[in-house]
């Protein structure tokens, strides 16, 4: 099974929420790993991430990753 390299970038708000997680992570995972599985592998609770961005696309947490890429993770926005 082939492996892919994924770079995760946390936005400042998410970085503040997840202080124990570095703001940039490089992970090597099997091709076909879902976004949700990647987050769990990185120690990031999937519910803490509202949006996952790849380039100009928004990914669903059930989307499978097949190529080396960089993902930006956004936290939920609080407000009233």
What residues fall within each predicted segment?
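Ubiquitin-like/PB1-type beta-grasp interaction modules and other compact soluble beta-rich domains
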Residues: 1-79
